[in-house]
Amino acid sequence: SEKIFSRAGPQLQQACRDIGRIQTGAAVITEGFNLPCDAVIHTVPPHYSGGDHWGCQSLNQLKDCYENAIKIAIKHNVDSLAFVSLGTGGNQFPHMMAAQQALEVLMKYQGEFQNLIVCLASPSSLKIWLKAYEQLHIRHAA
């Protein structure tokens, strides 16, 4: 998110300060300012602990991040939506688990957008997401 804030300019940081804190799993929208997009949807992913009933609360909150961001995008007539892999950085979600949660939501809404993109940081992340997609596809086909 530091890269996004530095590229967007100080207006984005001020817009976020004006909004204030949001709850884990919630999402809000701001202008894109100096970014090559009309808007930025912000969400707060949970920290993964695995200790709360095997991480169920965290998993549900992670799904909420995607779901709430998508609902805001639909409400604002966004036709292209890009996500990063939420929760996998400092929030410590295992990449496979995060990918599975994200894909369950993203696949449900894929027809709502002209482009629905996930930006991944590395080839190894792409392999994990592709494996998660294959597993989800097999599970839904059965």
PLM-predicted stretches and their roles:
Residues 48-142:
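Phosphate/ribose-phosphate-bearing ligand recognition and processing surfaces
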Residues 1-75:
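Glycine-/small-residue-enriched capping loops at alpha/beta junctions
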